[in-house]
UniProtKB/Swiss-Prot annotation:
Residues annotated as binding Cu cation 6: 1014, 1060, 1065, 1070
Functional note: May function as a ferroxidase and may be involved in copper transport and homeostasis.
Main location: membrane
Cofactor list: Cu cation
Name of the protein described by the UniProt record: Hephaestin-like protein
Glycosylation sites: 121, 236, 361, 478, 489, 831, 944
Length: 1114
């Protein structure tokens, strides 16, 4: 009988043999690709094909598409990747029309090698840099100081007329995870100066597939594959701008810095086409379709791609909208079951107006059989809904519910929006809203829950149901109802665009005042919740005659589709005690159909300048369900209730929201959270069982939105239930002080990625060089630091493993069941606190300063005075951990919450890590399940919002002049926005070192403002994100108030770039290096443990059959 050691040895040998077989079966896929200069037309038809008008007759399109004395128009010179037949680069391969300006699609299976022979036919240096594959330093194609030279630098910038051969290996360490699609989406692009290279046009898509997924280069089991890249191509940032200016009829008088000229060159495109001009998105009714979707670009590049008339799945979840940020790549699986011409558009309002839409065509093809989705055995649910005009008050109490001040108190944040005078409308506006009636007479309204505010009634249905909406338009403008998440034909879509239908089929799209139309929608299995979804998934309906003006006018509501058996006979939920809907949006009343009427009613219209920035700002109402500054009523529940929160985002580029629920956590798609990020057209279902009684804040964690009133409160009553939460684990003591120090954002004095001194770098000196009216790289800040005892007489020195933390406070570790005790001393010169995310705390230990109905001792934690000490006690229940479907440890944060905007920008934030039981070494806070963990905070620390701005001006500016004038200067304010990682810029973050094949956890933190959308990209490696199942990525999307854990086993040695992929953030220094050392350099070999036994097939691909034979013989 074989003993255990021999059995293990044979199993290992068999595994190696299987890897070798895979490697033998692998192939080399060779591509010949050149960078070539071509003329590119963004709208070759000359028409807005969605509206059916010439571009010059469309007021929105003329901004971008009309050529003039000082306008380039719609045709630009670009440099594009194109594929050729062979190394002679003489015969270009056919390029699918729908790919537009994108390069060819590169495909390969795990085990393959992709070899790209690249020729640069452009007029300056370019390269090819891939995402999602294994490469060595001579095939990275990215220019930065990575401590290589010679042959390892030739890939970084290929000169004009030059060639380079890139070899990219598709190892198991970059394979699609088990529950992912067979082929996952990545990109490749030039990375010499990536922001300019990409805007010039050098970008393409790459698909990495499981073994056996491709059949003669095509994905098996898929009828059609399409690629769609959403981006605002900024031609101002193209290398060919000067050449393109020559296209103007009076080029010598063009001012490239003119704001209107720059705006005209921002092309809101899908695959390089706008206003419906993207061709070739044709499929057959019944086709199985894969959509490979990507985003790239800058801070404006928040895209939500909406497919009318169809649904799809991403990561097993039912959707009809895909969220795309710079360097976000997703694969969507669609069954084309709804014939017709359908719109594909970005739901961000400005992007829609700027032409980011096209048509895709689902046709009944000869010989192709499609089965129409049908419903049977369900109910017919009828709703009578009217569009009514009402006066809406965004602050009906007249009071800021968070601090008790009047909404019109002079100098308050709220007065900007609520003060009424001859040139300001104030807080009450005429709007159109959806309201429900009892029957078709539209005489008796159905009462609605007060928390819904200006939202329309909740439409609910189960799978197999029919929804009938009898809609009456009582308003003065044409309106409609367009739904998400249900099945409808062209006569029931409710969206007005040129889709080839007859006039009779368009009655649903444009319901006139006083008219009635009946919509009929169904909920077949094909559009219902998947097994991975919540019992009811969240959608919206809204008017779509003009989707921008209609929604800003107030016409939207929630729609829920539920699994069979979820609803009671009265349409309420069986599985929940309460259900709440929350819409986070900045309602731009200047874009409402009623804007002119509101000026007449509430102000003196003659005196108002519509283009005045302060006036426009006063009309941007940062609300939750149409209420600001904690005026939202009705969010009340009992301890232990099952609560379903349905959260919705709508709006514009600024509508990047992170909803934060103080005091309790929820589950969302298998993850335990207390924040959820929302973009326009993003909807989510959250499940909460509140265990913490009290009045709790519910806010948007984006700083400007918070200060502009996107705040509410929800109340958890005890309802005679026991609120006591018991923990049985350890008590972990931490001694933390806040104190002021001088912080240096770039202590080396170098732009480490460029190899230049800071004052010699055009980009770096904007932020880091001191002058008469510039602070430079050093600022006084407040930071959290750990001490050894409650006397605070000895600061705890940071170890080499903690060097990377930078400005962050200490890592606080605990396991589920533990209690955390933080003895906090405020050694700074103003009030601060410590507030944790995710944990269980009483009101006396929340560390947050707002009106929560408490007094006395329960208020002492809110703001600790200088020189004082306070002890916070936080418990760690199961719902504070990563959950059964999450990673080993969940990432949270703690920060001062007296004034969360100024406190965090002053520097007071740190990481909080909560692990499953048994993941911390006995007697320590060290992890037992990983070799290393690193915390990375990506944020633009806005020193203009620091408490210490005046002190920093006085201390560091050499000749500041009038302080208030300086503080209002745009260039000065920009110089104080430090685009950092852990408080370091331009490659100055140190300490990110690891060895090959170690298990590494990266703990990611996001905080900040509207610009703080960060796409964290690791060169050289990929990582796994766990959300029920694993997902392979090399870019992670971070928003303010979002915290995440990702897992990596690095296999490619070298010094690698780690950066935010948002263009302006890269340019402003949000990048650094991390080092992967050869495993042979480890001084002390570690025993094989669960943490170090990760194996990737790339380790074995160099083994030979003789080696295997020796192993087996032994």
């Amino acid at each position: 009988m074989m003993d255990r050691s021999n059995a293990a040895f044979v199993l290992t040998a068999c595994f190696i043999f299987s890897q070798l077989i895979c490697h033998v079966a692998a192939i080399t896929r060779t591509y010949y690709i050149a960078a070539v200069e071509k003329e590119w037309d963004y709208a070759p038809s000359g028409y807005n094909k969605i509206k059916g008008v010439k571009l010059e007759d469309d007021s929105d399109a003329t901004v971008f598409a009309t050529k003039g004395a000082h306008r380039i128009g719609r045709i630009y010179d670009k440099v594009l990747y194109r594929e050729y037949e062979d190394a002679s680069f003489t015969k270009e391969k056919p390029h699918p029309k729908y790919l537009g300006f994108l390069g060819p699609i590169l495909k390969g299976e795990i085990g393959d090698t992709i070899v790209v022979h690249f020729k640069n036919n452009g007029s300056r240096v370019y390269s090819m840099h891939p995402h999602g594959v294994f490469y060595s330093k001579d095939s990275e194609g990215a220019l930065y100081e990575d401590n290589t030279k010679g042959k390892f630098k030739k890939d970084d910038k290929v000169p004009p007329g030059g060639t380079h051969t890139y070899s990219w290996h598709l190892t198991q360490s970059h394979a699609p995870a088990d529950q992912e699609d067979k082929c996952i989406t990545w990109i490749y692009h030039s990375h010499v100066v990536p922001s300019k290279d990409i805007n010039t046009g050098l970008l393409g898509i790459m698909l990495i597939c499981r073994k056996g997924a491709l059949n003669q280069g095509q994905q098996s089991g898929v009828d059609k594959e399409f690629v769609a890249l959403f981006t605002v191509l900024d031609e101002n940032e193209s290398w060919l701008l000067s050449k393109n200016i020559e296209r103007c009829s009076d080029p010598t008088r063009v001012n490239p810095d003119d704001e209107d000229f720059k705006e005209s060159n921002k092309m809101h495109a899908i695959n390089g086409y706008f206003y419906g001009n993207l061709p070739g998105l044709d499929m057959c009714y019944g086709d199985s379709v894969k959509w490979h979707l990507a985003g790239i670009g800058n801070e404006v590049d928040i895209h939500t791609a909406y497919f009318h008339g169809q649904s799809f799945t991403i990561d097993g979840h039912r959707k009809d909208v895909a969220s795309l940020l710079p360097a976000t790549f997703v694969t969507a699986s669609m069954k084309a079951l709804n014939p017709g011409k359908w719109m594909l558009n970005c739901l961000v309002n400005d992007h829609y107006n700027a032409g980011m839409y096209t048509l895709f065509n689902v046709t009944k093809c000869p010989g192709k059989v499609g089965v129409a989705p049908s419903v049977s055995g369900g109910k017919k649910r009828t709703y009578f809904i009217a569009a009514n005009e009402v006066e809406w008050n965004y602050g009906p109490t007249g009071v800021n519910g968070m601090d008790g001040q009047s909404l019109i108190a002079p100098g308050s944040d709220s007065a900007v929006f609520f003060a009424q005078n001859a040139q300001r409308i104030g807080g009450t506006y005429l709007k159109a809203i959806y309201e429900q009636y009892t029957d078709a007479r539209f005489s008796t309204k159905v009462p609605k829950p007060e928390h819904l505010g200006f939202l329309g009634p909740v439409i609910r249905a189960e799978v197999n149901d029919i929804i009938e909406v009898v809609f009456k338009n009582n308003a003065r403008f044409n309106f409609s109802i367009q739904p998400h998440g249900v099945f409808f034909n062209k006569s029931n879509e409710g969206a007005l665009y040129e889709d080839g239908t007859s006039r009779a089929q368009k009655a649903d799209d444009n319901v006139q005042p006083g008219q009635t139309f009946t919509y009929r929608w169904t909920v077949p299995e094909e559009v219902g919740p998947t097994k991975s979804d919540a019992a009811c998934i969240t959608w919206v309906y809204h008017s779509s005659v003009d989707p921008v003006k209609d929604t800003y006018s107030g016409l939207f509501g929630p729609l829920l589709t539920c699994k069979k058996g979820t609803l009671n006979n009265d349409n309420t939920r069986k599985d929940t005690d309460k259900e709440f809907v929350l819409l986070f949006t900045v309602t731009d009343e200047s874009e409402s159909w009623y804007h002119e009427k509101n000026k007449e009613m509430k102000a003196n219209a003659i005196l108002i300048n519509d283009d005045d920035e302060d006036y426009k700002e006063s009309n941007k109402m940062h609300g939750i369900n149409g209420f600001l500054y904690a005026n939202l009523p009705g969010l009340e529940m009992c301890l232990g209730d099952t609560i379903s929160w349905h959260v919705i985002g709508l709006g514009n580029e600024v509508d990047m929201h992170t909803a934060y629920f103080y005091g309790n956590t929820f589950t969302h798609q298998g993850s335990v959270k207390d924040t959820v990020s929302l973009l326009p057209g993003v909807f989510g279902t959250l499940t909460m069982t509140p265990d913490n009684a009290g009045d709790w804040a519910l806010v948007c964690r984006t700083n400007d939105h918070y200060s502009a009133g996107m705040q509410a409160k929800y109340k958890v009553n005890t309802c005679n239930r026991n609120p006591e939460l018991k923990t049985s684990g350890k008590t972990r003591d931490y001694y933390i002080a806040a104190f002021e120090m001088e912080w240096d954002y770039a202590p080396t004095g170098l732009d480490a990625l460029d190899g230049k001194k800071l004052d010699q770098s055009e980009e770096a000196k904007v932020f880091t060089v001191t002058s008469d009216k510039r602070i430079g790289r050093k600022y006084v800040k407040a930071v959290y630091r750990e001490f050894t005892n409650d006397q605070f007489n000895q600061q705890k020195l940071r170890t080499p493993a903690e060097e990377h933390l930078g400005i962050l406070g200490p890592m606080l570790h605990a396991e589920v069941g533990d209690t955390i005790k933080v003895v906090f001393k405020n050694n700074a010169n103003r009030n601060y606190s410590v507030h944790p995310h995710g944990l269980y705390y009483s009101k006396a230990h929340e560390g947050s300063d707002y009106n929560d109905g408490t007094s006395g001792a329960d208020k002492l934690d809110n703001a600790i005075q200088p020189g004082k000490t306070y002890t916070y006690i936080w418990k760690v229940p199961e719902r504070a951990g990563p959950g059964k479907d999450g990673p080993a440890c969940a990432t949270w944060a703690y920060y001062s919450d007296v004034n969360p905007i100024k406190d965090t920008n002053s520097g007071l934030i740190g990481p909080l890590i909560i692990c499953k039981k048994g993941k911390l070494k006995e007697g320590t806070e060290e992890r037992s399940d990983v070799d290393r963990e690193f915390v990375l905070m990506f944020t633009v620390l806005d020193e203009n919002e620091s408490w210490y701005l005046d002190e920093n001006i006085k201390k560091y500016c050499k000749n500041p002049g009038d302080k208030e004038t300086l503080k209002a200067d745009d260039d000065f304010m920009e110089s104080n926005k430090m685009h950092g990682i852990n408080g370091f810029v331009f490659g100055n973050l140190k300490g990110l070192k690891m060895y090959q094949d170690e298990k590494v956890d990266w703990l990611l933190l996001g905080i900040g403002n509207e610009v703080d959308m960060h796409t964290v990209h690791f060169h050289g490696q990929s990582f796994l994100r766990k959300q029920v199942s694993y997902h392979r990525e090399d870019v992670y999307d971070l928003f303010p108030g979002v915290f995440a854990t990702v897992e990596m086993v690095p296999d490619s040695t070298g010094d690698w770039l780690l950066h935010c992929h948002v263009n302006d953030h890269m340019v402003a220094g949000m990048e650094t290096l991390y080092s992967v050392l050869d495993k042979s350099l480890k001084t002390t070999p570690k025993p094989i443990t669960a943490a170090s036994s990760f194996v990737t097939s790339s380790i074995f691909i160099y083994l030979s059959f003789p080696v295997l034979a020796m192993l087996l013989k032994a």
